UniProtKB/Swiss-Prot annotation:
Coiled coil: none
Biased composition (Acidic residues): 28-43, 109-142
UniProt-annotated stretches for the region Disordered: 1-55, 104-142
Annotated organism of origin: Bos taurus
InterPro entries the record matches: ERICH2
Protein name as it appears in the record: Glutamate-rich protein 2
Basic and acidic residues composition-biased segments: 9-27, 44-53
Stored PANTHER family: GLUTAMATE-RICH PROTEIN 2 (PTHR21520:SF2)
Amino acid sequence: MSKNVVIAEQEKNNEHCPEDINDKLSESTDDDGEDTSDEDKEEDSNPNKDTHAPLELMTEFLRAEMGHDYHLAKKLCQMILIYEPENPEAKEFFSLIEEMLLMEKAQNLEEDDDESEEDNSESEGESTEDPSEESSDECEDG
């Protein structure tokens, strides 16, 4: 083979290479486009597949939880569970919130009992103090 023939063949190969590369690139981008359209179709056909609670709902829940407003936190947690029934964190928080509410209720009942006992002892103490105060007033007048 002569040098001219070899050079001519290389030029032919070089001419075809860019086209081949462009074809391969367009094929790969076409494949990518098809993949995304398939994913879009899957998402459209099953809209409840990955339903998430709104971010605002989540932040309000965290604010209520951190602010120890357990009644509000319980309601917000229930709403999150409506959106995401299988959310493990929401399930765990829900049971913990219920425990906290029971503890608060028990504590409030104890405080109410303590206050009622204090009220009873104060009213008994006042009734014994009243006659002595009146007698001291009478002494001053005399």
